[in-house]
Amino acid sequence: MIYGIGTDICDVRRIRASLARHGDRFAEKVLADGELATWRARSARWPERGVRYLATRFSAKEAFSKAIGLGLHMPMTWRHCEVANLPSGQPTIVLHGALQDWFAARGLRCHLSVTDESDYAASFCVVEKD
């Protein structure tokens, strides 16, 4: 049974401007530790790739927060929600802390799709209840 659906579109230019204004602090606020390491590595090789990586993660977390119906209210926090990839490359949500407990207690599972183009990153999330 579908518990919730969320979608988000993110303007990559706004993410670029936030990084220019706030530097690494912006990424450190939005990304979980594993994501932060990937972002730093991608940004070092090709800064634009780092910006797009951050934009897709931002968009995916927004879509997920809408699908679970919490928005950005506890226990949903940026850093407790991590976007990872399965070996196949499929994006998935990995939860931590109180958010992981909240999600598991409700018997929920998530399906996520992300995409990006030059100026936009978009995500679609479906959360199901067992």
Curated annotation (Swiss-Prot):
One of its GO terms (cellular component) is cytoplasm. Its cofactor is Mg(2+). It is an enzyme of class 2 (transferase). Keywords: Cytoplasm, Fatty acid biosynthesis, Fatty acid metabolism, Lipid biosynthesis, Lipid metabolism, Magnesium, Metal-binding, Transferase. It is found in: Cytoplasm. Mg(2+) binds at residues 8, 62. One of its GO terms (biological process) is fatty acid biosynthetic process. Its EC number is 2.7.8.7. Its main location: cytoplasm. Signal peptide: none annotated. SUPFAM superfamilies: 4'-phosphopantetheinyl transferase. One of its GO terms (molecular function) is magnesium ion binding. Transfers the 4'-phosphopantetheine moiety from coenzyme A to a Ser of acyl-carrier-protein. Belongs to the P-Pant transferase superfamily. AcpS family. This is Holo-[acyl-carrier-protein] synthase. It comes from Acidovorax ebreus (strain TPSY). The gene is acpS.
